[in-house]
Regions:
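PRPP-dependent phosphoribosyltransferase catalytic core
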Residues: 1, 121-186
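Active-site-facing substrate-recognition patch
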Residues: 1-52, 183-186
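Short, well-ordered alpha-helices that flank and scaffold nucleotide-derived cofactor binding pockets
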Residues: 46, 50, 70, 74, ...
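Short amphipathic alpha-helix with an adjacent loop that forms part of the alpha/beta core around
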Residues: 50, 95-99, 165
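Short glycine-rich phosphate-binding loop at a beta-alpha junction
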Residues: 53-62
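Hydrophobic/aromatic beta-strand patches that form the interior of the parallel beta-sheet core
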Residues: 59, 81, 105, 132-135, ...
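Short, glycine/charge-rich flexible loops or terminal/linker lids adjacent to PRPP-binding catalytic cores
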Residues: 63, 68-105, 113-115
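A contiguous pocket-lining binding segment that forms or flanks enzyme active sites
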Residues: 95-135
Length: 186
């Protein structure tokens, strides 16, 4: 389905995390196809129902998690909100709030390092709510994240990542693209 929707890209990419990769999953391409998005999200919704109980709110980081979070929320009948970056920090805006003691599930399109979902977990904590876990379409974390809660994913996808100073020769020869939505300034 990733190839069919042109969501699996090959080349030289700088990920939102700052790491480099020779493959990139552009979930926006997958989600731009309603039929395929519904199929993927329906399957993920079933896994979520099986693994997480009593979800009051779905919280997604902008940009990538918004569509996935909304569709999962629609299918589960759960309120869905999102956090967006203000001055480089994920924040609740637009009147969104998380009531104290709410059970919150974080949903993202792709998890690699876990940075965005950990920021969302921080928002849940400062609102004195409960983090029930994480869900995503693509889990690229290779079990390297520092997450303490369970990740439910539709696809576990192992893609090699490299630090800028440890690029393989073949990758250094390919022009760089920066497709992610998080702007990291160094």
């Amino acid at each position: 389905i990733l190839r069919k929707t042109n969501a699996l890209l090959e080349g030289h990419f700088i990920l939102s995390s700052g790491l480099h990769s020779d493959q990139y999953v552009q979930c926006a391409m997958l989600l731009s196809h309603p039929k395929e998005a519904k199929i993927i999200c329906s399957s993920l919704s079933k896994k979520i129902r099986k693994n997480f109980k009593n979800i009051d709110i779905i919280l997604s980081p902008a940009m990538g998690g918004i569509v996935v979070g909304y569709e999962i929320g629609r299918q589960l009948g759960v309120k869905t909100i999102f956090a967006e970056r203000v001055n480089g920090k994920l924040t609740l805006r637009r009147g969104f709030n998380i009531p104290s003691h709410s059970n919150v599930l974080i949903i993202e399109d792709v998890i690699t390092t876990g940075k965005s979902i950990l920021e969302c977990a921080g928002i849940i904590k400062i609102n004195n709510a409960n983090l029930v876990g994480y869900a995503c379409i693509i889990d690229r974390s290779n079990n390297k994240t520092v997450l303490k809660n369970k990740i439910i994913s539709q696809i576990k996808f192992k893609i090699a990542t490299f630090k800028a100073n440890k690029l393989p020769k073949y990758l250094r020869k390919i022009p760089v693209k920066t497709p992610g939505s998080r702007n990291l300034s160094k």
